[in-house]
């Protein structure tokens, strides 16, 4: 019985000493966080999409608080979040232009010629390295295997009739779809763009039209 009591006392004392040690070390190595950084982080949406160019919302908040990034750096939050962060930082925020992703290809299954019927893994990066880069005759257009769909954290892009189509209402212009497209067909453009180029082929006119009826 005495052995159990001694063991309990030893464990308790050890725990107490470790607690005191950790408390002292915590105070000694404590790094004070800028209150502005905390306030800015509270206003950011928390998607951690990386569309701002930083690793996540924590990194962006730190950069904004340090003056290394503008108050309107978050593409997801847009103008409302930029205004709140600007107030925290005591700076005037310029007008934020809403952006959206855009797929530079209109060659869906009805318009683009198919060389063969494909059945297999649905991944654009993998298919881009095989001969002809997929089933479509055009080697520049959207393959339609959905790598961009998987990358989008906002469910803002879908494969419709063989090509990627962006839902502008849901798109936050984070750029993740841009990064994963092996043919670099997706770009970020102003939401209210009046003119777009819906073809990315570098072939000559006759070859373009023989592969896709809406090629240019």
Where do the PLM segments sit?
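Ferredoxin-type iron-sulfur electron-transfer modules and their immediate structural context
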Residues: 2-216
């Amino acid at each position: 019985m005495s052995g159990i009591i001694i063991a309990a006392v030893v464990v308790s004392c050890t725990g107490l000493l470790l607690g005191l040690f950790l408390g002292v070390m915590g105070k000694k190595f404590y790094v004070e966080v800028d209150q502005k950084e905390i306030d800015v982080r509270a206003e950011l949406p928390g998607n951690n999409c990386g569309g701002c160019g930083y690793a996540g919302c924590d990194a962006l908040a730190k950069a904004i608080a340090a003056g290394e990034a503008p108050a309107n750096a978050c593409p997801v939050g847009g103008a409302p979040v930029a205004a709140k962060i600007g107030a925290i930082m005591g700076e005037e925020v310029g007008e934020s232009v809403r952006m959206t992703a855009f797929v530079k290809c209109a060659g869906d299954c009805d318009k683009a010629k198919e060389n063969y019927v494909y059945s297999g893994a649905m991944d654009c990066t993998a298919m881009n390295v095989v001969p002809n880069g997929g089933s479509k005759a055009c080697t520049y257009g959207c393959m339609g295997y959905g790598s961009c769909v998987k990358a989008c954290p906002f469910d803002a892009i879908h494969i419709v009739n063989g090509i990627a189509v962006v839902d502008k209402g849901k798109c936050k212009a984070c750029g993740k779809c841009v990064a994963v497209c092996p043919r670099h067909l997706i770009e970020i453009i102003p939401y209210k763009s009046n003119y777009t180029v819906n073809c990315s082929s570098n072939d000559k006119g006759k070859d373009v039209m023989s592969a896709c009826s809406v090629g240019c």
